[in-house]
Each structure stands twice: as C-alpha cells, then as structure tokens.
Design a protein with these regions (language model features):
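Polysaccharide-binding and catalytic clefts of secreted carbohydrate-active enzymes
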Residues: 167-288, 292-307, 317-320
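Substrate-binding cleft of secreted/luminal carbohydrate-active enzymes
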Residues: 306-326, 336, 343-418
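Active-site-adjacent "subsite" loops/lids of carbohydrate-active enzymes
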Residues: 41-74, 143-144, 149-210
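The substrate-binding groove and active-site-proximal loops of carbohydrate-active enzymes
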Residues: 56-71, 108-125, 183-198, 248-260, ...
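Aromatic-lined carbohydrate-binding/catalytic grooves of carbohydrate-active enzymes
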Residues: 87-123
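Aromatic- and glycine-enriched glycan-recognition loops and surfaces
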Residues: 67-87, 114-138, 202, 258-265
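Catalytic domains of carbohydrate-active enzymes, especially glycoside hydrolases
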Residues: 75-102, 210-215, 307-314, 386-391
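Sec-dependent signal peptide cleavage junction
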Residues: 19-38
Length: 418
C-alpha cells in the first residue's frame, strides 16, 4: 500500500512538474511575445522608414576612394543602401542640390563640388542615375533632396562659383543682380523673385522627368534669421516695399510667408502634373514657434498641414531628447500631431541619430541622456508611433554606421526590422 501511495504521489508530482513546465513555457513565450509587441508598438506595414544621405556622405566617399568613378561610387552607395536595409529602412533621401548645384546632369545647375571636387566639373558619371538604380534594385525607395534657396554657405565670393552657375550669371547683370542676395556671410536666391521660383521649379521638374525617383524632398533652409533691428530692412525688404502686399498694408512677415507658399505650391503642382505617384515632402525645423516667428523661416506650417495643395508629408526635425529643458521630444511630438489633426498630409518624425552616444544637448540631463541611454532612439520611435505618426527619417547615413552611435542603432533596429 505504501509503495502504491508513493507511486501515486510520484505520478502526481511528475504530472505537476510537466504541467508546470508546459504552462511555464507558455507563460515565457507569451511574455516574450508581449515584450516584442511592446518594442514594436506596432508599426503599419507601409510605415515610412527613411534615412538621409547628405552632402557629407559624398565628402566621405571622396575621402575613402582615391580612384573615383562610376564603379567605386556604385560600390559606396550600395553599402549605404544595404546598411539601411539591414536596419529595416525602406527609403533613402539623397542630397542632389545642397548649394544651388546638382548631383546629376542638369540643364540649369552646375555639377556639385561635393561629388567632383570643383563646382561645374563633371565627375564622369551620373550619381543620381546610379543611386536610383541601386536603391530600386535593393527594394528601397529613393527621394531627391534639394535645398531651394541656399547658394553658398560661409562665402559671398561669386568668383568661387562655377561660371555656369545661374547665381553668378545673374549677379553679373545689373538687371538680375537682386535675384541673389548676400546676407551674414552667405549667398541665397531671393525668394521674392519670380525668376528664382521658376529656376527652382524647373530644377525639380527635370529630376522628375529624367530620373526614376519616388519623391522630391526639401529641408529647413528657407529664409535666414533676422532681428528686430533689421527684419523690416534687410534681404528682400526692397521687393516687399514695391509689392502690392505692402501697398495693401500687409506686413513683411505675411509677404515672406507668401513667397515661400508660392514656391512650395508650384513645386507640388509641377511634380503632380508629371507623375502623381511621386511624393513631395518638406522636413522643416522641429520647433513650431521658430517656424511661425516673425524673424525666421517664414514657413506657413498650419496652411501646409491643412491642405492637399502644398505637400504630401511634413517631417519635422525633432532633434531633442526627452530631457531637453524646453523642447522635450514628447512635448514637441505631441504638438506636431495635434497640429496635423486634419489628416490632410502625412506626418513623419525626423530623428537625430547623430546625437546618440555623444555628449551633446541643452543642459547636463539631456547631454547625459544622449551619451548614456542606448535606448534613446528606440524610445523616440515607440513614443511617436503611439501618438500616430506615419513614419520616420533618421539623420544620417554616417551616423547609422558610426561606433559612437552603435549601441543606440542596435536597439533602434529592434523596432524597425521585424
């Protein structure tokens, strides 16, 4: 009887152990699944996951290869695309006009010195053609990125520009000299000139007509910043004083916003008239107060967010951490999502990979956050997804592969690639 009882007890114990292992395993698997789901937060299958390939990356290419030709450039760019793919990215935003120039054979703008070493010098191959081919061959979308108004940064010497540069040509003629303006040591196309708008729009049209791009992208270089002492007298103030808006008693702030609006609307219209499937988006500075300030940018952001006539998407550059003293990532993201409630355009969030692993930020708390928190990029993606954003763009390629940001990028991958 004792033996029988022992066998019964043993059988019960074994059964409990087996059941315990089974349910324990199920519990662990359920917990793991829950953790994975929590990490993902969860993304839509068509979520935009892009990264910027800036003019810095062309400079890095030139530094890496002594022999620079179509073969070495294709090799370099293929590495960039494959890196993005390995992290779960599905779009690359390539700089094609950083300084009133071109990374392709243009009818309007000179070759960029960022690719050939000297403005106006043909590199011997067409970078944009190679980039579109490589991106699509690897299942990745590609957008052509332009800076519309910037001609030269840190120099006002027109002789440093190519003789084929329209800015230099215009400067050489009195009639068109004000199409280009010098301000605080840099050169800009004058936003208030119709000839300038036509040039910029034509430059976009030739890209969409001649290259298999999926989108046109502009970033935050619009008007430069003014002060209370010169806001009414500097830059394009002369054009304002001669305008019907001035005569109609509308102030210079409204005038400047309207110049940018006209350009943006014209680009959107031109792109859609050529190929409705090609997108047009803008990545403005992340602080809405700065965008709507009477002293800088002159971006009519509320109009763009609440109309289908200007852009397909807005991608604010929210380049701050959760510990920023004033512009906390969560607060700024909330403000953008609230501003875009009409759902007329998509909202992507621009994220600063270049800060991860670096001692950078406003105040000791934010600097420590960027320097030590390996989950910072992942948490930003998770937070923005929870708030309903449509995707992300990460700045930039060099930082996605740098040693300093490696830990944060490794964690980022967990919420992008699955």
């Amino acid at each position: 009887m004792l033996m029988k009882k022992c066998k019964i007890v043993l059988t019960v114990l074994m059964t409990c152990l087996l059941l315990g292992n089974t349910f324990g395993s199920m519990a662990v698997n359920a917990a793991e699944a829950s953790d994975t789901q929590a990490e993902q937060t969860i993304a839509n299958t068509d979520e935009y996951k892009a990264f910027w390939f800036s003019y810095y990356d062309y400079t890095a290419y030139r530094a890496k290869y002594k022999k620079r030709n179509a073969t070495t450039f294709k090799k370099y760019f293929t590495h960039a695309v494959k890196k993005g793919k390995s992290l779960g990215m599905n779009c690359i935003i390539v700089h094609v006009r950083p300084f009133g120039d071109a990374m392709y054979k243009s009818k309007y703008f000179p070759w960029s010195k960022c690719i050939s070493g000297k403005q106006g010098k043909n590199p011997g191959y067409d970078p944009l053609k190679i980039m579109t081919q490589v991106a699509h061959a690897n299942g990745m979308k590609i957008e052509a990125w332009i800076n519309p108004y910037r001609v030269a940064s840190g120099s006002t010497n027109y002789k440093k520009l190519s003789t084929k540069n329209p800015a230099r040509k215009w400067h050489n003629k009195k009639k068109t000299r004000r199409n280009v303006l010098a301000y605080k040591g840099s050169l800009y196309y004058n936003p208030a000139k119709a000839q300038v708008r036509n040039l910029i729009v034509n430059g976009v049209k030739e890209i969409v007509e001649n290259y298999d791009v999926d989108g046109i992208h502009m970033d935050d270089y619009f008007y430069p910043a003014f002060s209370s002492s010169n806001v009414n007298s500097a830059f394009d103030a002369k054009e304002y004083r001669a305008s019907t808006m001035a005569k109609g008693k509308q102030n210079i702030v409204r005038f400047r916003r309207e110049q940018v609006n006209m350009l943006v609307k014209a680009i959107h219209s031109a792109v859609k008239s050529i190929d409705p499937s090609v997108t047009f988006g803008i990545s403005p500075a992340g602080n809405i107060d700065n965008l709507t300030s009477r002293y800088s940018y002159y971006v009519d952001i509320n109009k763009w967010l609440n109309s289908s006539d200007y852009v397909d998407y807005i991608c604010p550059q929210i380049y701050w951490g959760f510990k920023h003293p004033y512009a906390k990532f969560d607060r700024v993201t909330n403000r953008w999502m609230n501003a875009a409630k009409s759902k007329k355009v998509k909202v992507y969030i621009g994220i600063a990979v270049y800060r991860a692993g670096h001692n950078i930020g406003a105040g000791s708390a934010e600097r420590r956050e960027w320097r030590t928190d390996a989950n910072i990029l992942k948490k930003q993606v998770q937070y923005a997804r929870k708030k309903g954003c449509d995707g992300f763009a990460f700045f930039d390629y060099q930082d996605l592969k740098s040693k300093k940001s490696a830990k944060a990028v490794k964690q980022l991958k967990k919420v992008l690639k699955y």
